[in-house]
């Protein structure tokens, strides 16, 4: 981390550490952990760190990351595994849900230890989050919200983020050629997500088999 860049970090009091996979998941994750560790121990950075875990990374590296990051995330990206395989045959949901499990166990074990020992190390005290890509594959809003609801049933999952698919690859026919990201749909999903998290709505109270997608012209709470 360059000193000038670190100065900018201090001004913002928070940062997001992320990377595409280089060589393999563990190699990439090890480098992310090293940056987070240096920020804490060498540069004495006490601000907020959100570290995006790499799917397929080892439990040991995820556990180490949680000692330096306030929040960890592993992105689901595509809700249905068959659609994930269609776009990225080398990926599967196991590589995503395994690190999620490691994070959950680390957070819960840390809380238990800190109840017994005041100075026990914290582990990702802000919990974990994930992201779903909207519009790249055939999932309905109902499919996406059922996944979100299941994830919120896990005690350490704090947020599911929704990101409208942006078409940047026109030659790959597996991907839809959208003229613009589905921003209205993305916004409706966030509104429905709010109902799930804060008002304890059930998914089938928002969408159902007859109407599996949120109405673009009306907010979910009014539909």
Which residue ranges define each predicted feature?
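Conserved alpha/beta core segments of nucleic-acid transaction machinery
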Residues: 209-223
């Amino acid at each position: 981390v360059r000193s000038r860049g670190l100065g900018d970090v201090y001004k913002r009091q928070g940062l997001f550490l992320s990377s595409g996979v280089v060589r393999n998941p563990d190699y990439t994750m090890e480098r992310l952990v090293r940056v987070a560790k240096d920020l804490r121990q060498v540069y004495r950075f006490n601000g907020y760190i959100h570290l995006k875990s790499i799917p397929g990374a080892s439990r040991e590296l995820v556990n180490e990351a949680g000692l330096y990051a306030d929040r960890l995330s592993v992105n689901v990206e595509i809700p249905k595994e068959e659609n994930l395989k269609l776009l990225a045959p080398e990926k599967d949901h196991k590589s995503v849900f395994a690190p999620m499990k490691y994070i959950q166990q680390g957070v819960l074990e840390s809380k238990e230890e800190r109840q017994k020992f005041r100075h026990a190390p914290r582990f990702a005290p802000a919990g974990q989050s994930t992201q779903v890509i909207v519009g790249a594959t055939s999932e309905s809003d109902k499919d996406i919200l059922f996944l979100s609801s299941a994830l919120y049933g896990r005690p350490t999952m704090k947020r599911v983020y929704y990101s409208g698919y942006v078409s940047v690859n026109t030659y790959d026919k597996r991907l839809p050629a959208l003229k613009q990201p589905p921003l209205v749909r993305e916004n409706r999903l966030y509104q429905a997500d709010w109902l799930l998290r804060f008002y304890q709505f059930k998914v089938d109270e928002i969408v159902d088999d007859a109407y599996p997608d949120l109405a673009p012209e009306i907010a979910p709470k009014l539909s």
